[in-house]
């Protein structure tokens, strides 16, 4: 009901009353009716103003300009599923049966070669120019420490087609033994992982390889401990 309709109803009600109410009792009724009419009109007017200017009503959370309240994760997943990646990628794992050497395999669980990357002569061949993330991890293990320090090295090298030479991209060296095991003491096992990773500009036809100095210490007890891979960025 609008404010104008409520005011009109009150005025019609007042006109319907006798113009003159006899005695004090009639005057009291007129006074009460006038007061009630005033309060009714004032309340209706106040309610109309509050609704009109939005002081009361459904609450809305105000967000910064241009920001939509959405969950971006489902949209991102849908977009990625509609647009399969065509970037070169490779992840190869060590052959646990190749004793005394680090041999990479691509036909194993959790291993892959995709979008042009090849595994040839134990090397990853780059299919196109671009930035690549190159990474590799090896895990060494041994029993006790000899009198001479054990130095473990792990290196990733690149044979570039542009200048036909081999250069080291990443390299690390570690020593798991700080002191030799005393004679007669229990020879405790030790484990030493070496991880290498970095981003490099590569050319089509480049070949990437890994090298270690002491393959006899490689630990193949668990899958996923020794691996090598590249990802085009």
From Swiss-Prot:
The record's Pfam families line, in alphabetical order, gives: TNF
Which GO molecular function entries does the Swiss-Prot or TrEMBL record give?
A: cytokine activity; tumor necrosis factor receptor binding
UniProt site positions, description: Cleavage: 34-35, 39-40, 49-52, 76-77
Q: InterPro entries, per this entry?
A: TNF, TNF_alpha, TNF_CS, TNF_dom, Tumour_necrosis_fac-like_dom
Kindly state one GO CC term assigned in the UniProt record: extracellular space
Tell me the compartments it is located in: Cell membrane
Which sequence ranges are marked TM in the entry? 36-56
Q: Which SUPFAM superfamilies match?
A: TNF-like
Processing and modification events after translation: The soluble form derives from the membrane form by proteolytic processing. The membrane-bound form is further proteolytically processed by SPPL2A or SPPL2B through regulated intramembrane proteolysis producing TNF intracellular domains (ICD1 and ICD2) released in the cytosol and TNF C-domain 1 and C-domain 2 secreted into the extracellular space.
Q: What is its main location?
A: membrane
Phosphoserine, modified sites:
2
Report disulfide bridges, numbered on this chain: 145-177
> Which UniProt key words apply to this protein?
Cell membrane, Cytokine, Disulfide bond, Glycoprotein, Lipoprotein, Membrane, Myristate, Phosphoprotein, Secreted, Signal-anchor, Transmembrane, Transmembrane helix
**Residue ranges that the UniProt entry lists as topological domain Cytoplasmic:** 1-35
What residues does the THD domain cover? 88-233
What GO terms describe the biological role, i.e. biological process, of this protein?
A: extrinsic apoptotic signaling pathway via death domain receptors; immune response; necroptotic signaling pathway; negative regulation of protein-containing complex disassembly; positive regulation of apoptotic process; positive regulation of canonical NF-kappaB signal transduction; positive regulation of extrinsic apoptotic signaling pathway; positive regulation of JUN kinase activity
Q: Which positions does UniProt annotate with glycan attachment?
A: 80
This protein's membrane topology, according to the annotation, is:
Single-pass type II membrane protein
| Residues exposed to the Extracellular side | 57-233
> Residue positions of N6-myristoyl lysine lipidation?
19-20
Q: Which family does it belong to?
A: Belongs to the tumor necrosis factor family.
According to its UniProt entry, the function of this protein is described as: Cytokine that binds to TNFRSF1A/TNFR1 and TNFRSF1B/TNFBR. It is mainly secreted by macrophages and can induce cell death of certain tumor cell lines. It is potent pyrogen causing fever by direct action or by stimulation of interleukin-1 secretion and is implicated in the induction of cachexia, Under certain conditions it can stimulate cell proliferation and induce cell differentiation. Induces insulin resistance in adipocytes via inhibition of insulin-induced IRS1 tyrosine phosphorylation and insulin-induced glucose uptake.
Q: How does it assemble?
A: Homotrimer. Interacts with SPPL2B.
The protein in question is named Tumor necrosis factor
Q: Which gene encodes it?
A: TNF
């Amino acid at each position: 009901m609008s404010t104008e309709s409520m005011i009109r109803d009150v005025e019609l009600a007042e006109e319907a009353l006798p113009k003159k109410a006899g005695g004090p009792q009639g005057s009291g009724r007129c006074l009460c009716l006038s007061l009630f009419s005033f309060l009714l009109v004032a309340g209706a007017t106040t309610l109309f103003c509050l609704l009109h200017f939005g002081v009361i009503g459904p609450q809305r959370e105000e967000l910064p300009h241009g920001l939509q309240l959405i969950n971006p994760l489902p949209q991102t997943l849908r977009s990625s599923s509609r647009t399969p990646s065509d970037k070169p990628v490779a992840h190869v794992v060590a052959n646990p049966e190749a004793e005394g050497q680090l041999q990479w395999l691509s036909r194993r669980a959790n291993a892959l070669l995709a979008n042009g990357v090849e595994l040839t002569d134990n090397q990853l061949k780059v299919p196109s120019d671009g930035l690549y993330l190159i990474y590799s991890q090896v895990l060494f293990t041994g029993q006790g420490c000899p009198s001479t320090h054990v130095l473990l090295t792990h290196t990733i090298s690149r044979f570039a087609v542009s200048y036909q030479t081999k250069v080291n991209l990443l390299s690390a060296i570690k020593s798991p033994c700080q002191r030799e095991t005393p004679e007669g003491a229990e020879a405790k096992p030790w484990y030493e992982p070496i991880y290498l990773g970095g981003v490099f500009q590569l050319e089509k036809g480049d070949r990437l390889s890994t090298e270690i100095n002491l393959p006899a210490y490689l630990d193949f007890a668990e899958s996923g401990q020794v691996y090598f891979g590249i990802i085009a960025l």
